[in-house]
Amino acid sequence: MAQPHFLLVTFPAQGHVNPSLRFARRLIKTTGARVTFATCLSVIHRSMIPNHNNVENLSFLTFSDGFDDGVISNTDDVQNRLVHFERNGDKALSDFIEANQNGDSPVSCLIYTILPNWVPKVARRFHLPSVHLWIQPAFAFDIYYNYSTGNNSVFEFPNLPSLEIRDLPSFLSPSNTNKAAQAVYQELMDFLKEESNPKILVNTFDSLEPEFLTAIPNIEMVAVGPLLPAEIFTGSESGKDLSRDHQSSSYTLWLDSKTESSVIYVSFGTMVELSKKQIEELARALIEGGRPFLWVITDKLNREAKIEGEEETEIEKIAGFRHELEEVGMIVSWCSQIEVLRHRAIGCFLTHCGWSSSLESLVLGVPVVAFPMWSDQPANAKLLEEIWKTGVRVRENSEGLVERGEIMRCLEAVMEAKSVELRENAEKWKRLATEAGREGGSSDKNVEAFVKSLF
């Protein structure tokens, strides 16, 4: 069989780029395939693809989405970006496929993440197979798929646990105002229903979601995760994907000075902004709780999910509390999350439950306080608290605010009352995740079988 050539297309956001690149590397390493990674110029300009230039069989195809600096200011910008993303992406992919048709390595298959749902149309024009790379858990896919069938009046879906409204991905919630995002997911599900033998690649592992990977009878889900840096499965600290030494010395030295499992790590990722009221409640909870913490707070304005009417950065929002906060813990604008989570001093991860962060908590065996914000995060929080039992989830008040007392309750539960149970469960998932993700593990085998099934 000739060397397969995959054209992998992803949206230019860090949460899409990272797992997609890691899948590309797994695909190359396990099968010897060639991968062309296609995305927008902003990914290159914002240095979102470090340390991949020397990967054999991996090349890049970039095109403009009209926002090459990556700065998105308002809702209109988002819509304009998506229009240019599709128009320019369609042309770039088509030109690339045509240029390689008669060469040594013609494109064999297109792989795409959520948002470039136009990729299958390109594949069909050239009579090529296309496969979706789902970068959220299988559980979230099951919810979206069942919802798309019109079975959404009561949240009781076949082969899934009972769901409350608070467990749904935010784009399916009755209070959702982002109809464009909901339409994107509906479009993907509708396309998959048209396929004769639909197959999707999922950033999960077999032992983590066995029932959810088989919950939809007519769709084959292939577990290819956890899509995290390879070094995380070996315990190596040499990989450049794990740390930036020149930036990490201050917080690593601070962590080194703390006792084992005593520090709360707080991070809400790069996409979502906390309201001023919410950040004040969180700050007060950390101050009054008195436990050492490491809190990542960005000083950037260009969040994907910005709070309307609030112009301050998050770091500006805590200005009035900063002195009190720094008497108890440490505030940084960036850290290597994996480096932090694997540190012996970390006892708890207060997380927004983004899927990459959720996987990292599992692979590194760290219990969590689940503080979901949007997208798939509420579903992920349900998994962490109720299914895998590695964390405690916060509850909002009637106004949608998580009060300081509730935050303190959850932190104390994870650090004290339920710490033994949660840590035992976390260690179990750490072992299973490492077995799946290491070289030659179940996910490597699944990737090999996937490629063989295509050709």
Curated annotation (Swiss-Prot):
GO annotations of cellular component type: Golgi apparatus
Pathway-wise, it operates in: Plant hormone metabolism; auxin conjugation
Assigned protein family: Belongs to the UDP-glycosyltransferase family.
The lineage is: Eukaryota, Viridiplantae, Streptophyta, Embryophyta, Tracheophyta
What role does this protein play?
A: Possesses low catalytic activity in vitro. Also active as glucosyltransferase in vitro on benzoates and benzoate derivatives.
InterPro entries per UniProt: UDP_glucos_trans (IPR002213), UDP_glycos_trans_CS (IPR035595)
Q: Which CDD domains match?
A: GT1_Gtf-like
Positions bound to an anthocyanidin: H16
Q: Which residues bind UDP-alpha-D-glucose?
A: Q337, H352, W355, S357, E360, D376, Q377
Give the EC number(s) listed in the UniProt record. Answer: 2.4.1.-, 2.4.1.121
Output the Gene Ontology terms for molecular function. indole-3-acetate beta-glucosyltransferase activity; UDP-glucosyltransferase activity
State the protein's name. UDP-glycosyltransferase 75B2
Q: Look up keyword Glycosyltransferase and say if it applies.
A: yes
Swiss-Prot/TrEMBL catalytic activity: (indol-3-yl)acetate + UDP-alpha-D-glucose = 1-O-(indol-3-ylacetyl)-beta-D-glucose + UDP
Note the Pfam families from the entry: UDPGT
Spell out the catalytic residues: H16
Keyword line: Glycosyltransferase, Transferase
